[in-house]
Amino acid sequence: MKVSFTATDFQAVLVEFQQQTGTTCHLSGHENTLTLPKTLGEGRVRSINLREGIFDLFVHQHRLDESLLIAAASRSPASSPVVLKFFVSGLVDGAIQGIKADVNAVAGQYCFVYCADQASHVEFVAGKDICTVEIVMTPQLFQDMLGDDQQMSQFQQWFNPHKLKPYWKLGKTSPSMAIALQQILH
């Protein structure tokens, strides 16, 4: 199944996803829970708003009966989030215009990604238990968090707010990260 988004606001994306898939949504304060329809498989996606409009935590836990391709249209750099995504189980493939390498990851890896104004897509592969945890923030919040820390110079060189371009960095989840992920999940 393919789902395409044209909206950039999370609430509008949520409505588009519900309309295209038949997913049900439960809202409770700062937390949204999407329950996947049986036609897709089973599982849910939780989103927790940590800071209104600029900082969210997403937890994907599902097993799909058919692969799900989610495509996002090009958007302004200011509305394209900076994402730190951890892969706890399963396989995820994707592509971002402007990045030559395949964008894919398996359990035990994490990625740091920014799509800038480029279109992108991600495919959640059927037949596998997929569990991911992602931290999503605005470019401005990310820049504010970097501050003047010299240890963050790699990101500061890439993260020029006037010349933002797509970025993808894959790494191995450390034991400390894995413990934190388990605490988030349980």
Regions found by a protein language model. Name each.
Residues 1-80:
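N-terminal low-complexity or simple alpha-helical regulatory segments
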Residues 8, 62-67, 87-91, 138-142:
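Generic structural motif
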Residues 48-49, 72-78, 85, 91-94, ...:
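Short, charge-rich binding segments
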Residues 54, 79-83, 129-134:
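Extracellular structured ligand-interaction cores
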Residues 62-64, 78-99, 109:
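Glycine- and acidic-residue-biased ligand/ion/polar-headgroup-sensing regions
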Residues 4-5, 91-186:
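Alpha-helical bundle regulatory/interaction domains
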Residues 45, 60, 84-86, 135, ...:
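Generic structural hydrophobic/aromatic packing signal, biased to beta-strands
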Residues 29-31, 36-37, 43-44, 87, ...:
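Mixed-charge, polar/low-complexity N-terminal
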